[in-house]
Amino acid sequence: MAAAALIRSTRCNTCRRYLLQSFTRVVGLTAQNSRLPNEPQRRQFFTTPYLNIKSSHRHLSDRDASAASNNEYFITNESANSSQAVPWYLQVEPVIEPTHPAVRQQEIPAVPANAPPITQEILQHLSLEIGLDDMVLLDLRGRDPPPALGGNVIMVIGTARSLKHLNVSADRFCRWLRSTYKLRPYADGLLGRNELKIKLRRKARRARLASSSGTISDTSDDGITTGWICVNVGSVDDPSVVQNMREGGFEGFGKVQGGTRIVVQMFTEDKRADVDLEQLWAPKDNVKAGDSEENHSYSTGGDYQVRSMPPITSENNSNHPISNVPRPLRRVDLSQRRSFSTGAGQHSARTDVDPESGYEVVDAKNESSRQEPPLSAIFSTLKEMSPEETIEQLGSGPEDKNSTEFLRDCYSSVGTSHNGNSALRLMLGAAGVSAQHPGYTKEYLWTLFLEQTASGYRISEPLGFEIASAFLVPRRLDAKEQGRTASEFVDFDIESAMRVMDNLSLNGETIIRKHRVYNMMYEALILGLRNERLDDVRLKALRIRTLMTEIGLDWQSEDTRETMQLRLLLGDVDGFYEIWHAIAFNEGSRTADDYELLFRVHAEAGNPVYARECLGVWISMMGREDPPVLPSASIISAIARCAHVAGHDADTFRLLSASDEWREVERLILSDLRTLEQLT
């Protein structure tokens, strides 16, 4: 029965297939499914000629599959060998990955030529130790006009990561400069280590109190979080120069003035983008493309040729053809904007016409050059006159133009030139104020100065010096204009002189480095001692000394000792000894005249404390000078007067730690001291 059932099952195609699969599973073989007759024919394509397929119904056996794998391995090796056979100049170079943005932020800028040796060390410290990013170095040396920080400045700009990092960076940088290079940097905008924390805590407390009471706290800028700190490193000197100065073998204190000034600008990221100092101090060639297109339309018109025009004025017919001179399209600018040119143009004596506006343009530079010879002669004549002659020749006042022959010659020489008349009136006004002419006042001179500068005319340095000196001349005793006090008059005079110096310094003049102008300011303050408190006068003297220190004046001129004397008379002891130490530092040794001035000025100042300190320190130093300062009649008299002001008497005063030469003349000092006691 089983055999009959088996035979019947083989008649069915499906049953027969199932029966065969049951046997093959037991043996461990895998049955191959036959392709259905309705399946479309497929042809397999290969890239190698080693495999040939005759029919789509033919299947690869195990031996054929192994042969195909061997052929594929052979093809792979052949392609590798073919790539190695390619010459080096035909091989494709591997793609180099771009630098990480963090690496670009920490790049150190290149040091310019002839920079101080400390510049590279400062950049290394700011980048590696401080951690400033996106550092930029701007070489402002030789900039015309020079920046307000000075004419020899190297500026470094960097970005701090946060407000806290900004304050910590500036504080650590200043401490590093003081400890490593013994410099005295000044950080503008830097708060102390705990001061910032305290102020921020107080600000947060006020905000909480305001929110609890239902009011809105003041969110205006309180100066705490400015996001900008300017570290003025100061004048950086060449170490070789300092070493050569130290090898001189002198005694004293001070430092070498001059050199390159380094300024480090530290910003937060937002503040740096807002201020944009790089664009402000960038050279003219590196301006932005947008600004260049707006302000210089002709520079963006493509390549064009320029013909040299004849210097004479000629009228050309516009119908004449001009070849090979392509010109850009003319752009009409309707915005009200004034353009200033810094280039040197071709100046002529004629009056040109502006092609854009149609107005006549007067060449003020040529006009001033034509009027320079008569004005120079008038200026020389005024300087040679005495005050009495000046008052007589200037007539009754500013409105007088023909009462004297001198005035008629002056106004006829300048003609109708506006610049010449303005400069002449300014020159006569300065001479009249200096001679204390009753018709010329300092207020009138100040008005003339404002008119001259507002018109755009430059003032020469000699004339500017005369104007500043005229403002500092003592006023007449009967001057009671507008009911102001003597202190207010002195403040007006000094402020006016400083404004004149500031205007000239912006034009590149060197009047701001003249000691004589500052000495006249000190003399004006001394005249105000009778009507003003001593503390107020000292504060004004300190302001003048700070200005002189920031400018970096050298103490080698003839007016240096006069400046030193005036400072002590005004109570500025620190300013006095600043110059006193600089004399030894610059000249190598002090002379007998210097010590005579030292003791005499302390006696004239009349301060017992300063006089006692001077006697206790500098009498013993005279024997240590090279060459030693020997006794003389003038120094003996000055020491006696200084001892009298200090409160010493002839019975108790002795020369302590003095040299043998000075011990021998001690009796002469005591004799002069007894004479002074008898006179008082």
From Swiss-Prot:
CC per GO annotation: mitochondrial inner membrane
Keyword annotations of the record: Membrane, Mitochondrion, Mitochondrion inner membrane, Transit peptide
Alphabetical GO biological process terms: mitochondrial gene expression; mRNA stabilization
Protein name stated in the entry: ATPase synthesis protein 25, mitochondrial
Underlying gene: atp25
PANTHER family linked: ATPASE SYNTHESIS PROTEIN 25, MITOCHONDRIAL
Predominant subcellular localization, coarse grouping: mitochondrion
Homology family: Belongs to the ATP25 family.
Protein's membrane topology: Peripheral membrane protein
Localization per Swiss-Prot or TrEMBL: Mitochondrion inner membrane
Region (Disordered): 286-326, 338-374, 384-403
Domain of life of the native organism: Eukaryota
Biased composition range(s): Basic and acidic residues: 286-296
Function field: Probable mitochondrial mRNA stabilization factor.
Skewed-composition ranges (Polar residues): 311-322
Transit peptide, from-to: 1-60
